[in-house]
Amino acid sequence: KLMNSNNDVDMAAALIMCSAEKAQALGVPRDKWVFPHAGTDCHEHNFVSHRHSFTDTPAIRFGGQRVLQLADTTLDEIQFVDLYSCFPSAVQLGAHSLGLSLQRQLTITGGLPFAGGPFNNYVMHAIATAMEKVRSQPQEKGFVWANGGYATKHSFGVYGATPPPNGFKHDSPQDQVDALPKREVTPTADAAGPATIEAYSVMHDRSGKPETIRAAVLLANGSRAWCVSNDTNLGAEMCTTEWVGKPVAIDAAGQLRA
C-alpha cells in the first residue's frame, strides 16, 4: 500500500504562466522566473491488448529522447528528475525506457504515495517543485514526466531558471509510436489450444487467499489472448514461482489449463 498512490492527501500546487514581458511589468523578481525549455507529448497504442509488449513503453522512450534533443541536454546533465509514480511499475517502466538507473533519485516530491491525486494533477506538484529547485540552484535544470491512463499518455518537460537560447520548443513523436507493430488479439473461442504465459495477475479474496488468475498468453501465431482460472492451488503456486514464459493451454471457454 505504501508504494502506491494515495488520494487521501490534502495538498495544493499552482503556477502562473506568462510572458517575460508581463512578469517584468508585474514586478515579479527575476530570481523567481522559471522557463520551460522544451516539451513533448505522445501516447502508446491506446488499447493495452494491442501493445506489442507489456514490458516496454516506446512512447516514453521517444518522447523523452525528443524533449532532451529539443532542450539540447541529457539526463546526465539534469540534476532534478521526477517520474510519474502511481505504482512501482510506472517508475520502473519510465526509468527503463529513459535509461535511468533505479538507484538514482527519481522524484523531487516524494512521489504519489505522499502527494495524492487526483489523476495527472500530481504533475502540477512535480512542476511546482522543479521550479523551486531550479530557483535555488539556477545553474541546474529539471525534467518532469507525466503519465495518464494505463501507462498510455505521456508528456515531458525540461525547465530552467535561465531562458532557452533558441526559445521554447515543442514536438510530438507520435508518428514513430504509431509506426510500431501492434499485437493482434485472438477471440477466446478461437484461441483454444497451446499457449505461453506472457503476463498474469493473481487476485485474492478478503482473507488474503488466491482466488482468481487473469493471464495474457501468446499463441503460436504471435497473437495475444486472455484467459482466467479459478484454480486456487495454481494461484498460490503462481505467487511463489515465476510463470511468465511457461507453456499452458486454454480451452474454448477461456479457462487456463496448466
Model-assigned labels for residue ranges:
Residues 1-55, 128-129, 136-137, 145-226:
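Condensing-enzyme catalytic core mediating Claisen C-C bond formation in acyl metabolism
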Residues 3, 37-44, 54-59, 63, ...:
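Conserved catalytic cysteine-centered active-site region
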Residues 60-68, 77-94, 127:
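Extended, hydrophobic alpha-helical segments in both membrane/secreted and soluble proteins
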Residues 64-77, 189, 232-236:
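Phosphate/pyrophosphate-binding loops at sites that engage ATP/ADP/AMP, CoA/4′-phosphopantetheine
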Residues 85-102, 117-122, 151-162:
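Short glycine/threonine-rich loop-to-helix capping motif typified by GTGT followed
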Residues 222-239:
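Beta-strand/loop nucleic-acid-binding surfaces
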Residues 234-251:
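Short nucleic-acid-contacting surface segments enriched for D/E, G, S/T with interspersed K/R
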Residues 253-258:
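OB-fold/S1-family single-stranded nucleic acid-binding modules
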